C-alpha cells in the first residue's frame, strides 16, 4: 500500500476520533469555550511526544517510517486541529470575548507544550527500563 494511503487512512481515523471526543467534551462542558478542541490538541500533543520518543532510533519500540507517518502525520494530524483552534479563537474575538480568546491562545500553547514534554518524558522513562 502506498505511504499516501496509509497517511490518508490514519487521517480518517484521527479525524473521526477528534469529532467524537470534541463532541463529547462540548456536550459535557458546553460550547461557550472551545473545550473540545483544547482537549483533543492537548491529548494529541501528549501522544505525539510519547510516540515520537518511544519509536525514535534509540527508542524502545521499533517502528518503520511508514508506521511513524501513519501515526504521527495521519492519525495525530487528523486528530489535532490548529485550524479549528484558530477559527474558534477568531470567533471569540469577533464576539468581543477577548478574555476567552486570550485564554484559549495562552492555555492551548502552554498546555500543548507541557503535554508534548510530558509524553516525551514518559517515553524516555519507558525507554530506559531494562529487559523487554
Swiss-Prot record:
Major localization class: membrane
The keyword Ribonucleoprotein is assigned to this record: no
Catalytic activity: fluoride(in) = fluoride(out)
Gene Ontology BP annotations: cellular detoxification of fluoride
Gene Ontology CC entries for this record: plasma membrane
Activity regulation field: Na(+) is not transported, but it plays an essential structural role and its presence is essential for fluoride channel function.
Binding site for Na(+): 77, 80
Keywords on record: Cell inner membrane, Cell membrane, Ion channel, Ion transport, Membrane, Metal-binding, Sodium, Transmembrane, Transmembrane helix, Transport
Entry's family note: Belongs to the fluoride channel Fluc/FEX (TC 1.A.43) family.
Name of the protein this chain belongs to: Fluoride-specific ion channel FluC
Organism: Opitutus terrae (strain DSM 11246 / JCM 15787 / PB90-1)
Amino acid at each position: 500500500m502506498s505511504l499516501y494511503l496509509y497517511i490518508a487512512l490514519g487521517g480518517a481515523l484521527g479525524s473521526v476520533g477528534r469529532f467524537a471526543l470534541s463532541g463529547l467534551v462540548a456536550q459535557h462542558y458546553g460550547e461557550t469555550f472551545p473545550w473540545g478542541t483544547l482537549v483533543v490538541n492537548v491529548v494529541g500533543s501528549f501522544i505525539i511526544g510519547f510516540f515520537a520518543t518511544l519509536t525514535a532510533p534509540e527508542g524502545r519500540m521499533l517502528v518503520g517510517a511508514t508506521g511513524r507517518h501513519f501515526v504521527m502525520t495521519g492519525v495525530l494530524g487528523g486528530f489535532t486541529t490548529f485550524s479549528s483552534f484558530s477559527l474558534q479563537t477568531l470567533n471569540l474575538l469577533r464576539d468581543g470575548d477577548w478574555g476567552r480568546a486570550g485564554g484559549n491562545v495562552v492555555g492551548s500553547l502552554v498546555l500543548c507544550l507541557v503535554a508534548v514534554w510530558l509524553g516525551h518524558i514518559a517515553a524516555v522513562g519507558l525507554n530506559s527500563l531494562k529487559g523487554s
